[in-house]
Structure formats: structure tokens, C-alpha cells
């Protein structure tokens, strides 16, 4: 099984591994040394809970060809369940 590790304040989310595609995985700050930064993404107006936000970030990272991503900011807007997130992408 593939594990998506969240930031310390979030829960661990587990996804089944795909036989056909390799998805981008979460990388903590202490694990990115030596990885090649390939860009950043920002996503806003995400409805749902923190796990939904992480799934969206993983999908966006996949679209950009990233193997890893690190969420650098994630916060809930003034409206409940409306999130903004920024992440760094790595190859």
C-alpha cells in the first residue's frame, strides 16, 4: 500500500498502490535534501477536509510530473471547509 504522510497536524492517509501509475508522494522537510525542486503549486477554494486537500495536491503534483511534493502552507479560509494550499514539487 502507498502511504501519503500529512503534515504533523494532519492524519495519515493510506491509498492502495496503483499497478499502472506512480503517484506523487508527500515528502517531509527533512527528506527533501537531494531532491530536485521542479516548481510550486498554489490551489485555493478547495472544499472538504484536510485529507481532501492533500488528495488535490497529489493530483496536481502528478499533473506537473512530480514524484514528491511538500506542503508549505495550508489553511482554512474564513468560510468553513474552504482551504488554500501551497506546495513545492520535486522530481
Swiss-Prot record:
Keywords: Periplasm, Signal
Main localization, broad class: periplasm
Location in the cell: Periplasm
Record-annotated membrane-spanning stretches: none
Keyword Iron applies: no
GO biological process: response to stress
Gene3D superfamilies reported for this sequence: Flavin-binding protein dodecin
Stored SUPFAM superfamilies: YdgH-like (SSF159871)
Protein name: Uncharacterized protein YjfN
Gene of this entry: yjfN
Amino acid at each position: 500500500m502507498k502511504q501519503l504522510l500529512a503534515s504533523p497536524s494532519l492524519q495519515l492517509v493510506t491509498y492502495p498502490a496503483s499497478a499502472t501509475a506512480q503517484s506523487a508522494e508527500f515528502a517531509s522537510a527533512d527528506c527533501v535534501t537531494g531532491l530536485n525542486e521542479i516548481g510550486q503549486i498554489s490551489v485555493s477554494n478547495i472544499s472538504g477536509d484536510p485529507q481532501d486537500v492533500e488528495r488535490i495536491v497529489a493530483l496536481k503534483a502528478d499533473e506537473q510530473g512530480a514524484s514528491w511534493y511538500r506542503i508549505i502552507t495550508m489553511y482554512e479560509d474564513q468560510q468553513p471547509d474552504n482551504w488554500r494550499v501551497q506546495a513545492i514539487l520535486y522530481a
